[in-house]
């Protein structure tokens, strides 16, 4: 074999070996790809271990956790199927209240990015509960927190965050521009109601799944306002109460029936001797019960109950265990307004059980300090001040504030009844603590149980003043 033939032979062998090697590499790549596809079930999630991803599907927050194990991604999540929250069940039988959440917003906000806010409340879908709140468009320990004692400003907004977390720009979702608000879930989407604008011309903006669906203009031009707690959804319809008119005299009160964000019916209450503000409402066997604030002349709380056709009944809690603040010492109650210390008030709630009533109230008669739950077995209808259970929640030496009801439907809990719950706002700063330039709050919440509970104090606990205040 001459030299040229040797060169040609060696070159041919090298080319053949190269082609075989290339084919083997291609086969290896195909094999790896096929194996990976089988392992992951054709899912394409990549990333580090324990990566938490939150998606917003069908207007309900759904949590997924992807765990990467040897290149195999396993996904766990909740069923996102929409339901209709019926609200037809009765309230669960309870013997006390178990601590549910505490967000420690003010304590965390001394060092972290936490919103200045007030009027927090909680509402639950069939998948989760969320904290809603009215921010002041400012952060704690920042110059824009100055002057946030003001209730109504163009910087206020309704936002929401995961339950039990301090509300920050990193975990909160914008809902509506608002200085008065409500929100609830019908099983298919969130309804939000945000009121903003001038005192003599405010407008309520209704959104369903984040889209504006309706507006309601102030009809008395006297500070249109709503619940500052959750609205109520029953069989696909949601209900809320709004007030327009004086805070120290007879005003106008309307109930609205809303479906998928559209008002389909409304009525005005005929209640010339009653005053309804900041109602705390809940469903019970297909009807809606609201317990409200009388800022005009009652130290006991007014109530209104109505069915899905908006046929309603009104009254006052008769018990001599008075629920408002300020209020007189417990004594002889009335099924009409108790006018002693009846002026002014604070948002609150109660739960009716037959002739009995769970009353939530501040421990102080004069200041928004402390909080307690009292069971009066005949208090809905009888006027004496006898009660059988008192559970301490916040000590009288610590600040409280607004409080309100929320419920957990059977579709969420798996129970055969509606679980009653409540939240308490723990206000810090001005006007009572003048060492600060700001006003804000944290919150705690409790749910009713038929088992052991604790008597204790769960105060805000922040040490004031902050750096910005000095």
UniProtKB/Swiss-Prot annotation:
Residues 36-90 are annotated as: Hypervariable stalk region. Its cofactor is Ca(2+). It is a single-pass type II membrane protein. Glycans are attached at residues 44, 58, 63, 70, 88, 146, 235, 434, 455. Residues 91-470 are annotated as: Head of neuraminidase. Coiled coil: none annotated. Residues 11-33 are annotated as: Involved in apical transport and lipid raft association. SUPFAM superfamilies: Sialidases. The chain crosses the membrane at residues 7-27. One of its GO terms (biological process) is carbohydrate metabolic process. One of its GO terms (molecular function) is exo-alpha-sialidase activity. It catalyses: Hydrolysis of alpha-(2->3)-, alpha-(2->6)-, alpha-(2->8)- glycosidic linkages of terminal sialic acid residues in oligosaccharides, glycoproteins, glycolipids, colominic acid and synthetic substrates. Its main location: virion. It is an enzyme of class 3 (hydrolase). Catalyzes the removal of terminal sialic acid residues from viral and cellular glycoconjugates. Cleaves off the terminal sialic acids on the glycosylated HA during virus budding to facilitate virus release. Additionally helps virus spread through the circulation by further removing sialic acids from the cell surface. These cleavages prevent self-aggregation and ensure the efficient spread of the progeny virus from cell to cell. Otherwise, infection would be limited to one round of replication. This is Neuraminidase. The gene is NA.
